Amino acid sequence: MPMTITEKIFAEHIGREVKPGEIIMCDVDMTIGNDITTPISIRAFNESGAEKLAKPDNFAIVLDHFIPPKDIASANQAKINRDFAYKHDLKNFFDEKDMGIEHRLLPEKGLVIPGDVIIGADSHTCTHGALGAFSTGMGSTDIAFCMITGKSWFKIPESIKVVFKGERGEHVYGKDLILELIRRIGVDGALYKALEFTGEVIENLPMDDRMSLCNMAIEAGAKNGIVAYDKITEAFLEEVKKYNPLRSEPKIHYSDPDANYSQVIEIDVNKLEPLVAYPFLPSNGKPISQAVKDDIEIDQVYIGSCTNGTLSDLRIAAEILKGKRVHRRVRLIVTPATQRIYKQAEHEGILDILIDAGAVVANPTCGACLGGYMGILGDGERAVATTNRNFRGRMGSRSSEVYLSNSAVAAASAIAGKIADPRDL
């Protein structure tokens, strides 16, 4: 029976063919928790009477949302995680000593492998599909069950094939591809579907951008986003192996040519501009030319998050900001996604460029993205952010506004004091 890549991953795990709509129980290759969600899982784990993790080397806790802790409550959450990690001698425990946002850190650590089934107690766990894995977010109780058994249940999703055709223009990145898709299909246009990203644009899309693309699959309601293994995946893993061993060998799957899709969406990117998603939904995408005409003044620019806090994002921002100054009315906050990215940006002189331009460079953290700290918006304030959500109150006050963009638009806007087109600089 012809199958998609997502279906093949599940079929390989349970030893037989699967079809959409079927409910299965499946071994999980990597289970992920963070400082916010894991304490609930730990409580359920302890209440179950379990004494040890089913797969300790396949379980990771990443302290990333409020690290270093912002207050007593977040410090206590971190302590619950630390105590559990030390008690169980958890190998894959990451805190201030080796910090990063989970969805960018774990691929760096060689813990995300093509062909994996991955679950995490965070909705943006779908990021890891960029490496050809099935990866999805679940609730803390589901995570606890997997901690105890090493398994989880899944309903096999139908797949939507998204074909990006043509060639990307100047300052058009993975972020713009996913914003365009969400603009077309809406925030529930892929509800419980697997979004399979294909086409000549994807074949030439760098891994950082593929991760941005898969990261926001959930913003269309998708169960997962996925890109098939290819030379770019291989090159990424070879780079990872220079500083971390891979957890296991890749298991490579490709969709059959006659696989069944619930929908095929073709997007010609030849004329696609950088996009800006207006408040209060990621689906409110508008071309940068329209945003410039709307003359939208801003108070803050935030470059970071699991979507766009990568080294390539910092390089893009530095290229635009070099020799320039942030507008006197604007705050620019830059948050590298991992400590390795931070160190490499420092090595390349990127941090000096950003600081000289007037930016604040924060430690790796989710921080302001979820309205946590390190860049919260006040009443009536307006921000351009390279994050993934712009719901009302997402980054602070309920009367604030967040406009989502790529890093080039964000950097240009920081200079102009209003939403600006980086192609005009």
UniProtKB/Swiss-Prot annotation:
<protein>
    <recommendedName>
        <fullName>3-isopropylmalate dehydratase large subunit</fullName>
        <ecNumber>4.2.1.33</ecNumber>
    </recommendedName>
</protein>
<dbReference type="InterPro" id="IPR015931">
    <property type="entry name" value="Acnase/IPM_dHydase_lsu_aba_1/3"/>
</dbReference>
<keyword id="KW-0408">Iron</keyword>
<keyword id="KW-0456">Lyase</keyword>
<keyword id="KW-0004">4Fe-4S</keyword>
<dbReference type="InterPro" id="IPR011826">
    <property type="entry name" value="HAcnase/IPMdehydase_lsu_prok"/>
</dbReference>
<dbReference type="GO" id="GO:0051539">
    <property type="term" value="F:4 iron, 4 sulfur cluster binding"/>
</dbReference>
<feature type="binding site">
    <location>
        <position position="369"/>
    </location>
    <ligand>
        <name>[4Fe-4S] cluster</name>
    </ligand>
</feature>
<keyword id="KW-0100">Branched-chain amino acid biosynthesis</keyword>
<dbReference type="GO" id="GO:0003861">
    <property type="term" value="F:3-isopropylmalate dehydratase activity"/>
</dbReference>
<comment type="pathway">
    <text>Amino-acid biosynthesis; L-leucine biosynthesis; L-leucine from 3-methyl-2-oxobutanoate: step 2/4.</text>
</comment>
<dbReference type="InterPro" id="IPR018136">
    <property type="entry name" value="Aconitase_4Fe-4S_BS"/>
</dbReference>
<dbReference type="InterPro" id="IPR050067">
    <property type="entry name" value="IPM_dehydratase_rel_enz"/>
</dbReference>
<keyword id="KW-0028">Amino-acid biosynthesis</keyword>
<feature type="binding site">
    <location>
        <position position="366"/>
    </location>
    <ligand>
        <name>[4Fe-4S] cluster</name>
    </ligand>
</feature>
<comment type="function">
    <text>Catalyzes the isomerization between 2-isopropylmalate and 3-isopropylmalate, via the formation of 2-isopropylmaleate.</text>
</comment>
<keyword id="KW-0479">Metal-binding</keyword>
<dbReference type="GO" id="GO:0046872">
    <property type="term" value="F:metal ion binding"/>
</dbReference>
<dbReference type="Pfam" id="PF00330">
    <property type="entry name" value="Aconitase"/>
</dbReference>
<feature type="binding site">
    <location>
        <position position="306"/>
    </location>
    <ligand>
        <name>[4Fe-4S] cluster</name>
    </ligand>
</feature>
<dbReference type="InterPro" id="IPR001030">
    <property type="entry name" value="Acoase/IPM_deHydtase_lsu_aba"/>
</dbReference>
<keyword id="KW-0432">Leucine biosynthesis</keyword>
<dbReference type="InterPro" id="IPR033941">
    <property type="entry name" value="IPMI_cat"/>
</dbReference>
<comment type="subunit">
    <text>Heterodimer of LeuC and LeuD.</text>
</comment>
<dbReference type="InterPro" id="IPR036008">
    <property type="entry name" value="Aconitase_4Fe-4S_dom"/>
</dbReference>
<dbReference type="GO" id="GO:0009098">
    <property type="term" value="P:L-leucine biosynthetic process"/>
</dbReference>
<comment type="similarity">
    <text>Belongs to the aconitase/IPM isomerase family. LeuC type 2 subfamily.</text>
</comment>
<keyword id="KW-0411">Iron-sulfur</keyword>
<dbReference type="InterPro" id="IPR011823">
    <property type="entry name" value="IsopropMal_deHydtase_lsu_bac"/>
</dbReference>
<dbReference type="InterPro" id="IPR006251">
    <property type="entry name" value="Homoacnase/IPMdehydase_lsu"/>
</dbReference>
